[in-house]
């Protein structure tokens, strides 16, 4: 079958690896956010926050080094996962990652213009036609 899939057979394991790294970015970004916002300042753990931040930034730089794997003509689940992880990181933490990752930064600027990404922003309603 020539039907397109979100999980391409030829790149299945590369795709799953990229998804796992994106999931790790999200987990660390959420943990960092919880530590910074839900825990009283005098009980926060600076070393834990630093570990979360380092894991996030190292993972994003790893993706930048594998950038060519994200540049396929059809939309794949690894692209969606990475875009969501980068967008959330920018929203809740920092966009400083973009300084060392110009390819990912430019790619994210393009992918976030797509309707499916715009429609999932907080507070946005989208009509499907």
Feature roles, as predicted:
Residues 1-46:
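GST-like domain detector, emphasizing the conserved glutathione-binding G-site
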Residues 4-8, 42, 72, 118-123:
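Short, hydrophobic secondary-structure boundary micro-motifs
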Residues 8-14, 68-79:
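All-alpha amphipathic helical-bundle segments outside canonical DNA-binding/catalytic cores
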Residues 27, 36-38, 89-99:
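Short helix-capping/linker segments at secondary-structure and domain boundaries
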Residues 47-65:
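Amphipathic alpha-helical packing segments from all-alpha helical-bundle domains
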Residues 73-94:
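GST superfamily/GST-like fold recognition
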Residues 99-122:
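C-terminal end-helix/capping segment
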Residues 125-129:
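Carbohydrate-binding/catalytic loop surfaces
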